[in-house]
Amino acid sequence: MDEDLVVALRLQEEWDVQMARRAAAAREPVSLVDASWELVDPTPDLQALFLQFNDRFFWGQLEAVEVKWSVRMTLCAGICTYEGRGGMCSIRLSEPLLKLRPRKDLVETLLHEMIHAYLFVTNNDKDREGHGPEFCKHMHRINQLTGANITVYHTFHDEVDEYRRHWWRCNGPCQHRQPYYGYVKRATNRAPSVHDYWWADHQKTCGGTYIKIKEPENYSKKGRGKTKADKQPASAVENKDKLCRGEAQLLIPFSGKGYVLGDASTCPSAGKLNTSYMVNEAKGLSSQDHSVSGLRLNSNAEVKCEQNCLPKKPHLVSPLPTASHQSVLSSYFPRVSVANQKAFRNVNGSPVKNGTTGDGTKRPASGGSQRKVPPSRASLRNTSKVTAPASATVTSAAGTSATISREESGSEDQFLNKRPRLEDRTALDTIKEQTQSGGDLRSSSQPTAASAPQSLSSQRRLVNCPVCQGVVVESQINEHLDRCLEGNKTNLRPRRV
C-alpha cells in the first residue's frame, strides 16, 4: 500500500476523533461557574437567578421565599431567616461583600442560602446545627449537577476585614493574649460594652478598658457636621418624648381668619342689610301684590335680625333709601299709585274703590291742608282688627331706646312706620306732580257731571285709609292720604337699635 495513503488515513481518524469530542462537549450544558460567564454576564439579575435555580434544583418549592440585597450587612456574605412554620422566609445577600467578588461566588452563595430556605420550607431543619447531614446531602447533589463548589463557610475574610474600620484595643493584660491580642474590629462605630456576650468574662479575666485606636479617614469631621445639622433644640426633643409617652399634645394657636358666633364683625353692616332688603322688597312688589300685614311681618323680622346681629354696638339705621338707591329702583320698577290694589284701583293717579259705578268730581289734593279726624269718626273704625299702642319703644343692648310715635292713634301694628312702603311714596309723588302741573284729578272714564244723590252718597260713604287703616269719608280720602303720607315722612327719623 502506498505510504501516502496510509498517512492520510491516520490523519483522518485523528480528525474524526477530535470532532467527536467537540460534539460531545457541545452537547453538555455549560457549568454554572464556568469562567466564560464572567464575560457573558458579569452582573446577573438576582431575581432571575433565584427563579431559575428554584425550578431546576428545588422543584419550585421556594416560590414564596423573598430574596433581596442588603447594603449594611458586612460580617457575612448571606443570611436566611425564617419566622416559624407557615411564616415568612427571606434570603438576604451582602452587596458590599459580593460586589468585590467574582460571579462564581455570587452563584455559590445564593445556592447555599437556598438550601437553608428549602430545609425551612419543607420543615426538614431538625439538625442541631445549620449545616448538618440534610444540608450536606443537598449541597453534594447540586455540586455534582452544576460543577459548583458550594461549601459550608465562605472564605471572604479579606473583604470582611476591609469593612472593619473601627478598631479598639484593651489596655489591660488581654492585649498580650492570643488570638486577638486585645483588638476589637467592627464595621460600625459601636464600642465594646455590656451588650456584648463576652463582656462579663473580659471583666473577670482582664478588667481593662477599650480605647479606640483607628477609624475611617475624616470620620470625626463628618460625624460632627452631621450632629450639628441634625441637632434639635432641647424643647423639641422633650415635646417629642412627651408625644411618644402619650402625654397631652401642645396646642398650636390658629393663625387664620376665624368667625365668632354673635360677634358684630361677623354680621353684615346695617346699611348693607337695609339696602339689600329694600331691593328685595321692590322686586317682590313688582312680581306680586303684598298686603299690609305681610309688610309688617317683614319689618318685625328685620328689627329682630338687627337686634341679634348688633347686640353691643348701637348703629344709626336709616329706613329711607338714599337718592342713588331711589333712582335705581325707580328706573327698574314702575311706580304704583294706589297702596291697596285689592280695595282700590288707579284712575289717573287717584284711588278709586272697586265696585263703585260712578264717583263725583275729585278735588285737587292740597299738601298744606291741616285737617284732623273728629273723635266721633275715629270711633267708627273697624273694631274687629287688633289695635296696638300709638308708640313703640325699641331698646338696644347698650340701653339706648328710641320712641316712634304716630300722628294717627288707630294703627294696627307698632312697627308700621319702620320702613316706608314703595307704594306710599309713589302715590304721593304722583299726586304732587299732578298738583304742580295744574291738572285736575278728574277721571276720563267717568261722566263729567254727577247727580246730586250720587254726590251725597259719596260724601256719606266711609272707606278705609290704605296707609293707617282708619275709617275716612270717601270724598276726603285724598286729603287724608296727603296728611298720612306727610306724617310718615316726618315721623320716620333715624333710630338706634
UniProtKB/Swiss-Prot annotation:
Residues reported to bind Zn(2+) 1: H112, H116, H131
Site (Cleavage): K228, A229
Chain span(s) of sequence motif PIP-box: 326-333
Disrupted-gene phenotype: Embryonic lethality caused by genomic instability. Cells display impaired lesion bypass, incomplete DNA replication, formation of micronuclei and chromatin bridges and eventually cell death. Cells show an accumulation of DNA-protein cross-links (DPCs). Sprtn-haploinsufficient mice are viable but show accelerated aging, characterized by cataracts, lordokyphosis and cachexia at a young age.
Region annotation (Disordered) ranges: 344-459
Binding sites annotated in the UniProt record for Zn(2+) 2: C465, C468, H480, C484
GO terms of biological process kind: DNA damage response; interstrand cross-link repair; positive regulation of protein ubiquitination; protein autoprocessing; protein-DNA covalent cross-linking repair; proteolysis; response to UV; translesion synthesis
EC number: 3.4.24.-
Subcellular location: Nucleus; Chromosome
GO cellular component, one term: nucleus
Residue(s) carrying N-acetylmethionine: M1
Cross-link Glycyl lysine isopeptide (Lys-Gly) (interchain with G-Cter in ubiquitin) mapped to chain: K342
Cofactor: Zn(2+)
InterPro entries: Rad18_UBZ4 (IPR006642), Spartan (IPR044245), SprT-like_domain (IPR006640), SPRTN_ZBD (IPR055220)
PTM annotation (Phosphoserine): residues: S269, S384
Basic and acidic residues bias spans: 420-432
Subunit and partners: Homodimer. Interacts (VIA PIP-box) with PCNA (when ubiquitinated). Interacts (via its SHP-box) with VCP/p97. Interacts with RAD18. Interacts with KCTD13 and POLD3.
Name listed for the protein in its UniProt record: DNA-dependent metalloprotease SPRTN
Species, as recorded: Mus musculus
